[in-house]
Amino acid sequence: MKIDKRKNYYIILDTETTASCTPEENIERKIMEKLVYDLGYTIATKSEIVIKRNYLVKEIYENNDLMNNAYFNSKKPMYDEMVENNQVEVKPFAEIVKIMQNDIAETGVKFFGAYNVGFDLDALMQTSNFIYPNIFKMFFKKTKSGKFAPDTIKFCQAYLFRKELEIIDLWTMACQTLCSQKTFQAFYLQETARGNIKSNAEIVYNYIEDLEGNFAEDHTALSDSIIETRILQRILRIRKTLETKFAFLPYRLIERVV
């Protein structure tokens, strides 16, 4: 692998998670529990993917009680078959993090991104504290309401990335670019019950690949991170100054043009 230091490198990560309670109970919690069992990421430039990694987190994946609570627990036999066929490795979380840190250092990654990046940052922090309780010093930030909440960005930068990467949310970026294009709204427009334009990764990927709605996400970490990388690469080709790269409820940034 040859690294061109003149280029920007991005790590695009996706997680599949479970919890210590059922999905129905978890969604009622003030803060949803997110324990990572499937972690996948790419490292890419604006034109190519140079690294693909996929691991199952040993401490979570091999805990049957936790896996029974996974939203996509019906996929457990599929994962078991992937492990048996050497398509994915089961590793301790600390080892996965070390591999990721080495990849970040060796490629000179500057940006960390995901589609709804806040979810994945929180999942990484929660998983760290679940597997290794009372080890990490927590960071807190003041919210707009004046209360304090865990600072997932500082946590991940300090302990998991070992580098102050710029955080980018592909959902936020897609809403200001691809989802605000006339062709997207003319041919791929779908709305929620509240009348908001749908802007999930599946719809956006169908649009950029002209798949007419025939593509459905696998909801496995590496597969999803690859399509999210393709979305990022398309966004990077658009010459537009973005208002922000990480916003709360980013669908509100979509400009209706049709």
Regions found by a protein language model. Give the residues of each.
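Acidic, Mg2+-coordinating catalytic module of metal-dependent nucleases/exonucleases
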Residues: K110-V117, D122-A123, T183-V258
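Conserved non-catalytic scaffold segment of RNase H-like nuclease domains
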Residues: K2-M125
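Hydrophobic/aromatic-lined pockets within catalytic cores
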Residues: S128-Y132, L178, Q233-K240
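Short, glycine/acidic-enriched loop or turn micro-motifs at the edges of active sites
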Residues: T15-A19, T172, I227
